[in-house]
Amino acid sequence: MTLVFNKSTEALSSLVNVLLQLPGKSSYTEPCTALSNATIGQHTRHIIELYQCLLAGYPAGEINYDDRKRDMLYENDITAAVNLIKEIQLDLDRPDKPVKIMCQTEDNLVFIGSNYYREVLYNLEHCIHHQALIKVALLSIKDIEIADSFGVAPSTLQYRQQCAQ
């Protein structure tokens, strides 16, 4: 399952690369009308927090993605967000094991069986989805180099490569 960890690390690295190119705090925290007034910082925080939920729930084998801290620090401070992303990258590679995903419905707490590797894959797909949204905001900022693969699923990249041959 090294591939899943490598792809997750690559996706997080590409996010860090883009964040470090931002010309200032305002480009990280300024609402983007194309994103329903969400910010790059809000999307970054959301990516971070799902990975945090996964890592925090790993020891007990119970992961609750709804129980996010919603820490404004990572929404407003690029340096703090980048540093935490780097910590997540270092901590992600763990042995596979069964886990339960906790989900609160209107009336009940539901547990869904999964495993750690599957949840790393889920977080990768979630990260890429939010990168695609972040890319919309980035396109309005000058002098930022955005990789063609940023915000694009690996399967889509493979398909595009096959079509180009």
Question: How should each PLM-predicted stretch be described?
Answer:
Residues 29-67, 109-151, 157:
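Short, contiguous alpha-helical
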Residues 8, 36-40, 44-47, 74-81:
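Hydrophobic alpha-helical segments and helix-packing faces
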Residues 25-32, 100-102:
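Glycine- and aromatic-rich loop/turn segments at beta-sheet edges
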Residues 1-24, 41-57, 125:
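Alpha-helical bundle segments that constitute or directly flank the non-heme di-iron/ferroxidase center
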Residues 2, 49-91, 97-109, 142-165:
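Short, helix-capping/interhelical loops that line the mouth of catalytic, cofactor-
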Residues 14-17, 21, 87-90, 136:
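A generic structural signal for well-ordered alpha-helical segments enriched in polar/charged residues
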Residues 20-26, 106-111:
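Short amphipathic alpha-helical segments and their helix-coil junctions
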